[in-house]
Amino acid sequence: MEAKAVARNIRIASRKVRLVVDLIRGKQVGEALAILKHTPKAASPVVEKLLKSAIANAEHNYEMDPNSLVVGKVFVDQGPTLKRFRPRAMGRASRIHKRTSHITVVLNEK
């Protein structure tokens, strides 16, 4: 049985979120939460909140034991890009891409 949680349109570039997500793939849930707690990246509180949501989904919806959960699949997809302009010298402007990401966490029982 799998329990899943998805966070969409997170305002952090997917390349940066993947650095955090790669740390917890395949780990037990308690260990993954400890790793995220001590990771000094902007994406780690977001991934930690999503992992807690997946644990709650497993407990409530599927009646799984939270102590026997393992992070099965975790992946980050690119979301829509917000396009903005930054004023530059001599009346010009350059385009800025504010990237978003979709994060998915799937938990399995050990």
Swiss-Prot record:
Single GO molecular function: structural constituent of ribosome
Entry keyword Metal-binding: no
SUPFAM superfamilies: Ribosomal protein L22
InterPro entries, per database record: Ribosomal_uL22 (IPR001063), Ribosomal_uL22_bac/chlpt-type (IPR005727), Ribosomal_uL22_bac/org-type (IPR047867), Ribosomal_uL22_CS (IPR018260), Ribosomal_uL22_sf (IPR036394)
GO biological processes: translation
UniProtKB keywords: Ribonucleoprotein, Ribosomal protein, RNA-binding, rRNA-binding
Superkingdom to which the source organism belongs: Bacteria
Chain ranges passing through the membrane: none
GO CC term, one of those recorded: cytosolic large ribosomal subunit
Family membership: Belongs to the universal ribosomal protein uL22 family.
Quaternary structure (record): Part of the 50S ribosomal subunit.
Role, per record: This protein binds specifically to 23S rRNA; its binding is stimulated by other ribosomal proteins, e.g. L4, L17, and L20. It is important during the early stages of 50S assembly. It makes multiple contacts with different domains of the 23S rRNA in the assembled 50S subunit and ribosome.
Protein name: Large ribosomal subunit protein uL22
Native source species: Brevibacillus brevis (strain 47 / JCM 6285 / NBRC 100599)
Underlying gene: rplV
